[in-house]
Amino acid sequence: MYVLLTKRLARSLWRTKIRLVAVLLIIMVGVFSGIAFGHYAHTASTMYDEIYADTEDGINLPDIWVENPGAVWNGNQADSWCEHISTQWPESELVLNECEARLILDGMLLIEEDEEESKLIPAIWHGIDEGYIDRVWMPEDDCCSGRLAVADDEIVLDAHIADEMEIAIGDTISIGAGQGIMDYTIVGIGFHSNHLYFATPGSILPAEAGTFATGYLSSTGLERLANLSSGSANRLLIDLVGSPDYDLLSTDEVEGVELAELIISIRSSIESVNSTAIVYDRSGVS
């Protein structure tokens, strides 16, 4: 029965050669697309593992983030939160290595299009001193060069925006955060883990040229720009000893059971002192 049906199908397709060719082409495209995507996924996974690693060439991606979405802690508050998390650490096989405060603010980049007109581009500015966690990535490549921002009027510009807008080291740009706009000298070109996929927040599409910017100042540089006190922060970056598993949203299993339990404990500890901060691991990073 099956043999007869197969023969009839073959005769029918042979009578319509164009349809047969189309079917074969669709099958071939599907097979080659699957192979190509599998190779890309493997390559991308390996590349990101190397970037995120706690090595000399990596950036040491945090294991846990504590984010204050509605406000900014002053320096004393940020330090006390790290101390609170350390002293309230639960019994766990996961060991705290570092807790670093970080300031990240929405802002703008001012571009002079001609002598009479200027353009404001939405931006995100990071206050990053040379810490231990989530460092600026500046590989030895044509894409990147220079050094980290040290002075409070220096900035490392993201390589995506530098390449798109033909901005180079030594150039001066005008940026804002809050109510002020100030000039900063570009001393480096690099990348950051938050913006390896360069898109505006909330969008799944890559940002078009001239529509979004990111840059990495010193902590004092961003505090100066936003008129904030020394040590201000709205993120806590927590690094654990080793590389614990974390839950993958693409599966139904809970891969990082110990990390999930630790996050619940940290969240409960923070909520006990009436904080609105949110706590998440790498699975919660978009």
PLM-predicted stretches and their roles:
Residues 2-286:
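Membrane transport/envelope proteins' first extracytoplasmic loop
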